[in-house]
Regions:
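ATP-dependent helicase/translocase motor core
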Residues: 1-214
Length: 214
C-alpha cells in the first residue's frame, strides 16, 4: 500500500471546510459530564472553547471563566481539549483570547479586526474579537501560522502560545514587506519597531516559519 497524507483541514480554501458553532455541547468522560458554553468546530474537530460569564453578576468574572476552562475542564474532560487550540473568556465587556494552557495573566484582548482599525472598546470588543480572530478565514490563519508549541525537551511540554493581535498584524506586514523586497530586489524591507515586552521574539518565530514555507 502506498502511504498518503490526509489533510483534516483545508487551510487554503476556507469554503471547503465545515464550520460549526455549538452551544452547550455535552462532553462525557468517565463519570464526568460537562457542558462548555460554546465550542467552535472545523470539520468535526473542536478548535476553540468559549466560556461566558454574566456581566450583571458581580461574583462572575472572566477569571472564573478561565478557571472553568483551564482547571475544571482540563481536569474533568481533557479529551475534549486535546485538539482545542484556542480559548476565549468573556463577560461581554471584557474579552480575551489565549489557549487552554495560557495562564490568566497572559490572556489578551483582540482589539482590532484589521490593522488600520482603531482599537475597540467596551461591548464592541466582543464583536471585534469574533470578527478579528474567530471568523472562518481568520481562525484558519491563526491556527496555521500563529500557534506555537515550544520544544518539549527544552521547555514545559504543557506550554502552548497563540499570537496577540499586534504580533499577528506585525508578522503579516513584515512578511509582505520582505516578499516585496525580494521580488523587487531592493534589499529593503522587514524593518520592525516594537516596544519592550511586546513579544518580538514570538513575532519573529511566527514570521520565520511563514517565510520558510513560502
Amino acid at each position: 500500500d502506498n502511504p498518503f497524507r490526509l489533510e483534516y483541514i483545508d487551510f487554503e480554501h476556507p469554503d471547503h471546510n465545515i464550520f460549526r458553532c455549538v452551544n452547550q455541547f455535552v462532553m462525557e468522560q468517565g463519570r464526568e459530564n460537562r457542558r462548555p458554553d460554546i465550542l467552535l468546530f472545523i470539520n468535526g474537530i473542536p478548535v476553540c472553547i468559549i466560556e461566558l460569564k454574566n456581566p450583571t453578576k458581580q461574583n462572575a468574572t472572566i477569571h472564573d471563566a478561565h478557571t472553568q476552562i483551564c482547571t475544571r475542564y482540563m481536569r474533568d474532560i481533557p479529551a475534549l481539549l486535546k485538539y482545542c487550540a484556542l480559548a476565549v473568556i468573556s463577560d461581554g465587556a471584557k474579552n480575551a483570547l489565549g489557549t487552554t494552557y495560557t495562564p490568566f495573566e497572559f490572556f489578551y484582548e483582540w482589539k482590532k479586526i484589521e490593522n488600520e482599525d482603531k482599537a475597540g472598546k467596551g461591548l464592541d470588543t466582543l464583536r471585534t474579537l469574533i470578527r478579528g480572530a474567530l471568523s472562518p478565514e481568520r481562525i484558519l490563519e491563526i491556527l496555521r501560522d500563529y500557534v506555537y508549541f515550544p520544544d518539549p525537551t527544552k521547555e514545559d511540554d504543557t506550554t502552548e502560545i497563540v499570537c496577540r493581535y499586534p504580533q499577528f498584524f506585525a508578522a503579516r506586514l513584515l512578511k509582505q514587506s520582505i516578499i516585496k523586497s525580494v521580488m523587487e530586489q531592493t534589499g529593503k524591507g522587514g524593518t520592525y519597531f516594537g516596544a519592550t515586552g511586546c513579544g518580538k521574539t514570538y513575532t519573529m518565530a511566527f514570521l520565520a516559519r511563514q517565510l520558510a514555507l513560502q
